[in-house]
Structures are given as C-alpha cells and as structure tokens.
Amino acid sequence: MAAVVLAATRLLRGSGSWGCSRLRFGPPAYRRFSSGGAYPNIPLSSPLPGVPKPVFATVDGQEKFETKVTTLDNGLRVASQNKFGQFCTVGILINSGSRYEAKYLSGIAHFLEKLAFSSTARFDSKDEILLTLEKHGGICDCQTSRDTTMYAVSADSKGLDTVVGLLADVVLQPRLTDEEVEMTRMTVQFELEDLNLRPDPEPLLTEMIHEAAYRENTVGLHRFCPTENIAKINREVLHSYLRNYYTPDRMVLAGVGVEHEHLVDCARKYLLGIQPAWGSAEAVDIDRSVAQYTGGIAKRERDMSNVSLGPTPIPELTHIMVGLESCSFLEEDFIPFAVLNMMMGGGGSFSAGGPGKGMFSRLYLNVLNRHHWMYNATSYHHSYEDTGLLCIHASADPRQVREMVEIITKEFILMSGTVDAVELERAKTQLTSMLMMNLESRPVIFEDVGRQVLATRSRKLPHELCTLIRNVKPEDVKRVASKMLRGKPAVAALGDLTDLPTYEHIQTALSSKDGRLPRTYRLFR
C-alpha cells in the first residue's frame, strides 16, 4: 500500500521528482527557468551584446523611391520603383482582356489566365517552372480582367535575371499543348459551376451589371468563358488572339524592389528581338472600339432557398444591383467619383472582418441601420480607360424586393443633394487611409505602377493622389452625381424576381425628385 501511495505522489509531482521520495510541506518553492548569465539583467530598451545590429528603413527622405520609365526600341515599356527589402515583385502587364474579344470566341482571356505558367520553350512543365522559382523563394500568379492581363512573380531580388527570363518565356513562348488545353477546359468548366453555386453572388452580379450597361460591346462582353465556347477554343484560336494583342507596344514590364538599370538590362536581354511562339510579332487586326454605355436590365431567375455553406441554411435572398455611368480613370472627375463611392460605403448586415468599418457611411446610416430586413447594401465603382460604372448592390427577402429597390433609388437621388462637410471629410480621410495602407504592400505597388504606366505611360505618386483627394469639394461631388443621374440606369437582378419593379419604373424613379417608384394598382391580390 505504501508503494502505491508513493507512486501516486510521484506522478502528481511530475517526472522531475522521481529521484526524491520525501514529501515537502509549507510554501511552494519557485523554480528559476533562466539559465543564468547576463541577458536577464539587460533592459528591453538596450540591445543584446554580440547580436548583429539590424538595418532599418530610413525616413529622412534622402532616398526618394520614384517611378522610373524607359521605353525600348520595340515599344515595350519598363517601369520600376525601388523599395526597401530583399524581395521584389516583377511582372508583365498586357493591354488585353475580355473587352477585346468582339472578333473572337468569348472566353479566350479566361483560358489564357488558366494556361499561364504552363510548359514553354525552355520549361517542360509547370512543375519545372515552380521548381525554378522556389530556388529564389518565388511564387507566381496570373490574373485577367476586362482590360488587362497580368503575369507576376515575387522572389528574391538576387534572382531578377532568372525571373525576367522566365516571365518572357511564359508570355512569349508558351507551348499550349493539347493536353494543357484539355485540362484548362475542365478547369474553366469547374469554375463556371462554382460561380453559379457559390453563396456570394457578387462576381456573377458584376458580370450581369456590365452585360446590362454595355450591351455586347467592349467591357460588356463576357468576362468568363460561356459554356458553349469551352469545347471550341483550341490552340489555333488562342494563337490568333495572341498574335494581335501580345505585342511589345501593348506590354509593360514592371518591377518593385529592383534597380531600374538592372531591370532594363534584363528586358533588353529577354524581351527585345524575341520571336514569339505564334510567329509574327506585329499585330494584324486590333479592336480599338470605345465603350458605348447603353443601360438596360439583365435578369436571372434562380431558386436561392437551398443555398448554404454547411448544415445551417442561408436565408433566401434576392440580389439587385443598380448602376449608372460615371467616368473613366483618365478624367478629372475620377477622384470626386472615388470620394462619392467611399461616402456611400455600405456593407453587409454582418462582417467577420471586425466591426466599425464604414459604419458612418450613407448606406449604413440610411439603409442598413433603418431597415433591419436588408442583408446587404454596398457601393462599387468600376472604372476603365473610356468609361466607368458606379453601382449599389442590395439584397433582401424576395417579398420585399420592391421596397428594397425604392430605397436604393432614393439613395441615388440623395447623392445629388446636400453634402455634409463632416461626412465629406470622413470619406476623404477614409479614401486616403485606404490608398496609403494598400500601398504598403509590395504586390499592390507593383500593380499600381504597371496599370498606370500601361494606361498613361506615367505614374501619379501617392502624395499627388492624396492632394487631389484633399481638394475635392462638396460641389464637386454634387456636380458629378447630378451628371450621373441624367443617364439611363443599368440593372442586374438575381433570385426570385416575382416582385421586381419593371425597368421603366426604376428609370422613372431615378428621374424623379424623391426616387419613389410609380404606384402600381392591382385588381386582385
């Protein structure tokens, strides 16, 4: 019995007490976990002895990280901005996308995005490309939008030569084998199915609002490949498109965290005088169409009652997006529109990203706070080189669709009304804060540099944009809103649309003084 008690006591005291059989009583003895030495006696405000001195970025302004741009003999632009750190982000941005597919099968840009970083003339497979990048701690990505295709790599700056050579090979020398194209067909098919089944309808609504606003032209063409075109797109079709739009004069090699001269040398080495895989380096037939805003409505009836992420069902909702033409990002009114969009703000009835963001924006104060049955009210601003679209997305129970649409049309009318000085300053401060916070990220700086140089051949620095934001006055916001309201609306509707007002009624509400929908009379209910 004594042996059992002794064993139990040892277990309670831990493995360190197996060498001692005598129980201790009284105050507990505290053990020092420090190994001794001088370090525990050094205050946190003093550096540890023998440790290399860290190198920090300076803020004295002696080194100005300005964007430098060089144009090569073939028309390709090289843009760079140095940045503190040992890693860089480098990529090729191309003036191509779904808006240029009017003379081609819709969906080519979608295919090219999924085929990116596959086998090339130098690399036999995607695995070989990834292995090469891993030697420099690198990752790669390709994204396409309606007007831009972007191939990007983030890696150690010491591997810049390898990275630029790899990017040149991926963009100009893709093999596009039958096996890769077939695999891409399955990937695109899966993505389309996922797009139609996901609970978040925002990507689909964005596609629909562009379709309604720009009927079958430029940015109104399908961003995603239509199902009927999946089997039709092959290597010959892709080469026909690449021959016209993957030309040096439509490209920008952008880099952040690199020396400009080194990047230019790499561009001359790998992107000058290179024969692309499709043969000719000169474009034959380029679509230079200007976006034509038409307005209209795009509707899609769908049963949203069974949409769920898990065992807990999501409430059945009808989603509406109403938009009006704004302006291109090349116009002076782009900044007032950006401030107006931030002033409208909005969001969902629940945000997992932390409470408080935008809670004093108009769509929160006037819509979500006053109408508990609305699940979402968010403002979006899409801007391109020749047009723009400011829209509001709202969602609610299908039985309250008419009331929801009227609330949104009223908010559009109020945009051209009185602008409170406090809310304007808050919106400008939020916009400036968001701009500067996003530009702390190296990949975001890369995209900003590349897109601006691609569109304007130069770049406005952040402090210039902040000055433009600060100079926006209440009358500027009122002016651009009044101008916007003179156009025809674009409407996208998804879900149970039984009680959806007609397009003519929505247009009438946006032309009125109070934003109210015309009254409807029913003989039978």
Swiss-Prot record:
The keyword Membrane applies. One of its GO terms (cellular component) is mitochondrial inner membrane. GO terms for biological process: protein processing involved in protein targeting to mitochondrion. Residues 1-33 form a transit peptide. It is found in: Mitochondrion matrix; Mitochondrion inner membrane. Keywords: Acetylation, Membrane, Mitochondrion, Mitochondrion inner membrane, Transit peptide. GO terms for molecular function: metal ion binding; metalloendopeptidase activity. InterPro entries: Metalloenz_LuxS/M16 (IPR011249), MPP/UQCRC_Complex (IPR050361), Pept_M16_N (IPR011765), Pept_M16_Zn_BS (IPR001431), Peptidase_M16_C (IPR007863). The modification N6-acetyllysine is found at residue 299. Disulfide bonds: none annotated. The keyword RNA-binding does not apply. Pfam families: Peptidase_M16 (PF00675), Peptidase_M16_C (PF05193). The modification N6-succinyllysine is found at residue 64. Substrate recognition and binding subunit of the essential mitochondrial processing protease (MPP), which cleaves the mitochondrial sequence off newly imported precursors proteins. Belongs to the peptidase M16 family. Heterodimer of PMPCA (alpha) and PMPCB (beta) subunits, forming the mitochondrial processing protease (MPP) in which PMPCA is involved in substrate recognition and binding and PMPCB is the catalytic subunit. This is Mitochondrial-processing peptidase subunit alpha. It comes from Pongo abelii (Sumatran orangutan). The gene is PMPCA.
